[in-house]
């Protein structure tokens, strides 16, 4: 059901509009993250994360980006970060 709603919205607006909206939502999340770092977590961070996740799902759908593609990149990035941390601890 949720997937159908996301796809209907994504199809209505199209990739260019949804990429712009994703950028806007990410900006709002960044502002809220900065605020939360100073004042502590609030409901605002949850709302902004939800907005970004909704937009990411739409962009993945419109761009035909698979979970496997994303997972592969995430794994490589996490491995690279773990290596950096290891170097920090040894340096």
Region locations from a protein language model:
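Flexible "arm" and connector segments at domain edges
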Residues: 1-91
């Amino acid at each position: 059901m949720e997937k159908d709603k996301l796809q209907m919205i994504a199809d209505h607006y199209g990739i260019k509009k949804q990429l712009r909206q994703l950028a806007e939502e990410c900006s709002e999340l960044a502002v809220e993250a900065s605020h939360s770092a100073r004042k502590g977590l609030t409901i605002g961070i949850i709302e902004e994360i939800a907005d970004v996740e909704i937009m990411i799902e739409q962009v993945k759908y419109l761009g035909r980006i698979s979970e496997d593609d994303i997972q592969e990149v995430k794994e490589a990035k996490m491995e690279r970060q773990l290596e950096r941390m290891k170097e920090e601890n040894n340096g």
